[in-house]
Amino acid sequence: MAGEIFTTAGLCIVLTLVGVALGYGILRVTQGGAE
């Protein structure tokens, strides 16, 4: 049970970090292209 919980939490953290990184990258590209 504990292993599954840690795995699920790890996946959630990774997905969140990936989402933030993608969003940040898109914003930088959009702002850089606009300027």
Swiss-Prot record:
Q: Which UniProt keywords apply?
A: Electron transport, Membrane, Photosynthesis, Thylakoid, Transmembrane, Transmembrane helix, Transport
Q: Does the keyword Cytoplasm apply?
A: no
User: Its Gene Ontology biological processes?
Assistant: photosynthesis
Q: What is the membrane topology noted in the UniProt record heading this document?
A: Single-pass membrane protein
Q: Name one Pfam family in it.
A: PetM
Q: Where are the bilayer-spanning segments?
A: 9-27
Annotated Gene Ontology cellular component terms: cytochrome b6f complex; plasma membrane-derived thylakoid membrane
Q: Which InterPro entries does this UniProt record tie to the protein? A: PetM_cyt_b6/f_cplx_su7
Record's subcellular location: Cellular thylakoid membrane
**Which GO MF terms are attached to this record?**
electron transfer activity
Record flagged with keyword Electron transport: yes
| HAMAP family found in the cross-reference section | Cytb6_f_PetM
Q: How does it assemble?
A: The 4 large subunits of the cytochrome b6-f complex are cytochrome b6, subunit IV (17 kDa polypeptide, PetD), cytochrome f and the Rieske protein, while the 4 small subunits are PetG, PetL, PetM and PetN. The complex functions as a dimer.
Please explain the role this protein plays, according to its UniProt record. Component of the cytochrome b6-f complex, which mediates electron transfer between photosystem II (PSII) and photosystem I (PSI), cyclic electron flow around PSI, and state transitions.
- What family is it from? Belongs to the PetM family.
Name of the protein described by the UniProt record: Cytochrome b6-f complex subunit 7
Q: Which organism is it from?
A: Synechococcus sp. (strain JA-2-3B'a(2-13))
